[in-house]
Amino acid sequence: MNFISNRSREHEFIWQVFLTCLIALPVMYPVAWTGNELNYFALAQHHLDPRPFTELYAVNSHQLSKIATDIVMGLADRYLGLDAAWFFSRFALMIGLAIAYVKMTRALRIEVLTACCALIFFLVVGHQTYFAGEWIFGGSEGKVFAYILVMLAVGLVIQGNVLPAVILLAVATYFHFLVGGFWAGALFVYLYLNGHNRKQVVFGLLGFTVLVLPMVGLLIYENKILPPPDVSGLAFTIDQIYSDIRNPHHVAPFKEDYFHWTGGFIFFLLFSGFLYLVKRRQLFWNSHFVLWVGCLHVYLLFALAIAWFDRYTQLLGKFYLFRPASLLYLLCLLVVFDAVAKHWLAVSKKRVKIVTILFFTIAIGALVIKMPRMVQSSPDSLMSSLNREEKQLIQWIRTNIPEGTVILIPESSGKPLNSMNFEQLIDRPTLVSWKFVPTTRYEIALWYKRILLKREIYEGKCSSIKLLNVSHALAVNQFQVDKLSLCGDPLFSSGSYVLFTLH
């Protein structure tokens, strides 16, 4: 009988994972590369074999603290090829997220239908977060690997399995220091609130600290190997450049002295209120878990207060204080949806049918909308997304421009060929890209100076060419052709694209 029962649970688990994958498919299917994916695969490639890649590459960093991500993505690129590695990594991460999500929801005793509805709501409403542009289900990045391990760890901690959870959290930290590190600390707080054996909690904390010490060493090392930043001529500090100029959507809600995340904050307050009702009326079986999720909501309020006082200096911007908002939103949804399902829907079969039909209609609708692009997609989509003129340009550059030659490309061209994928496609350095900003202080200063000088070149200020020491630039429209004509001569044209040799 136990054997039959175990087989039944295994089948139920597999079907729940399959259903979760189906729900996540519209956002995880590899329809098109994201800028982040291009950057992270390039970084992984560079770190695994740095010899061909110099500091002239736009995607180049001395950061070592995502070593696990670099190893996994770099090896996938090396043995599968870039496009195939990206294509299959999307599916691998989708399955990994599905397994982790199911494991976590089962540990929380969330019923299958409730877990599915909560995930649909999470993906469709609020863009997977309260605010700060965070997400879990989306692309191939180090933080997605980390979230898989964190969700598995949440499930283990709920079940009282501290040691394996500590190991998973340590590994998650090597994939993404901020994700793994924050949720490790948060889960130790949960163990304390839950009254777990204090001796085990202390040993678990010590074990985690020992396991991540090499990571701490890498963080110190990567900030010591570089010279101090050269901020001469800059109107902003390094922290202001990183937070206010490049990443305000993630870390600077009070930029220019007014609150930019009003809609998300109202959403946050609404679900905080729901969570309070669940706790007060004891509508969830694990009251300590509800208290813990509530405490994490209070943490976000403190983070907003800190961001207000830090709005001029941005000293803490690089720590991404709001990164937990995404997983916290998902955990809150699970608690609230479980309470609604067991204490409101349970009294009426009609309510259950209406809600079930509504949610699965939304899920099927999202899948149908995405299906045409999903069917047309293929593992070679990085090149196949280009038109004939763009492919001709890429081929000409690869054939006629020596390797190692820097070719500037403007930002935000609005075309399939852009500053995010150009460097990968031509296999030559492009010096700087707005999309990729490094994280060490020296490199941030260098990045911003290069951004400003490149902008001046595309405005026709030819004196900036010598400061950047570049010889080629690509124009993608007539305005840029007119400006670059002041500083150089056309070398090759393909449609609206004109490659210039700069004087």
Residue ranges and their predicted role:
Residues 1-10, 158-164, 191-203, 330-357:
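Membrane-interface junctions at the ends of membrane-embedded or membrane-associated helices
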Residues 10-13, 23-98, 104-119, 128-146, ...:
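Active-site lumenal/periplasmic loops and adjacent helix-entry segments of GT-C-fold
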Residues 25-41, 45-66, 82, 177, ...:
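Transmembrane catalytic cores of multi-pass membrane glycosyltransferases
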Residues 79, 157, 171-179, 213, ...:
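Transmembrane helix irregularities
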Residues 101-110, 157, 340-344, 397:
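Transmembrane-helix signature of membrane-embedded glycosylation machinery that interfaces
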Residues 145-164:
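Membrane-interface transmembrane helices that cradle and orient dolichyl/undecaprenyl
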Residues 209, 343-373:
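Signature aromatic-anchored transmembrane alpha helix within multi-pass, membrane-resident enzymes
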Residues 387-391, 395-455, 459-480:
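Short periplasmic/luminal acceptor-recognition loop of GT-C membrane glycosyltransferases, typified by
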